[in-house]
Amino acid sequence: DALGASKAAAFDLSAGCTGFVYGLGVAADMIAGISSRRTRYGRNEGGIALVIGSETLSRITDWSDRATCVLFGDGAGAVVLRWNASEGGILATMLRSDGSGRDLLQLPAGGSEEPASHRTVAERRHYLRMRGREVFRFAVRAMPDGVMEVLERSSLEADEIDLLIPHQANQRILEAAGKALNLAPDKVYSNLEWYGNTSAASIPIALCEAADEGLIQHDDVVVCVGFGAGLTWGASAMRWSVPLPAEPRTAWRRGRYAALQSYAWVRSLVRRFVRWLFSRGVKEP
């Protein structure tokens, strides 16, 4: 609504800490399909998708549980995908799940299996619970396997990775994954010391910061990999095709974006007012 994207499809996709990789894969496939249909019918334009990873884990963190409360943070990050017929961009994505590990990382109550009640609240069952050792063993196996699968699909080798962007779970997991892939430490990006584990937001935040720091150059091979509750895991290999250096954010561009945002806000306000009038029995114009 605030963006003014009133004709765009919008939906939530939940896959725990792997959510951003899932969203990336789904969005890439959708805009590729939309763009191919447009090309077939003579419309020379590609699809565009905005993929957002966002989480507020502080709402479900038990601050009396020292095993989990020091790990998590809140955050949000986003990327824009644009269809392009040339080589590059997202090369391959893999998505997996294993429901047998659902109890390793979960919110015990509040869902359909155990609805909220006075008892569940009193027993503090609406907070995140994690079996850390089992999650660690799963992560250090699943992340390298996911990376190798997307590399194979992309006809690439591990030594061709310019930068690995893993889900920022904990430093030991990141180091173990990098070691399993024989990657130098400087090829495994980490910003854990600033934000902690921000779930689905961790990969887009890390990707954005790595690009801002100049760690990703045009035509670099970048692999994003994540794992999370479910259990879920996934990876996406891409060849960085964003033109660098990026277009500078001049005062005119900032003013233009601010004006567009203000226009979208006013339009939304008018539409809501019209709907309110209609609900009061006034005929819609």
Task: Explain the meaning of each model-derived region.
Residues 65-137, 141, 145, 239-285:
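Condensing-enzyme catalytic core mediating Claisen C-C bond formation in acyl metabolism
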Residues 14, 49-55, 72, 81-82, ...:
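Short beta-strand segments
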Residues 10-12, 51, 90, 188:
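Conserved beta-strand scaffold positions in the cores of enzyme catalytic domains, especially
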Residues 8, 45-48, 220:
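Nucleotide donor/acceptor-binding cores
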Residues 28-36, 41-76:
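Flexible, glycine-rich active-site loops centered on histidine and acidic residues
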Residues 53-54, 59, 98-104, 171:
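Acyl-CoA/ACP chain-elongation machinery
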Residues 1-4, 51-57, 112-120, 173-185:
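Acidic-glycine-rich active-site phosphate/pyrophosphate-binding loop
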Residues 6, 13-37, 140, 144, ...:
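Claisen-condensing/thiolase-fold acyl-transfer catalytic domains that form or cleave C-C bonds
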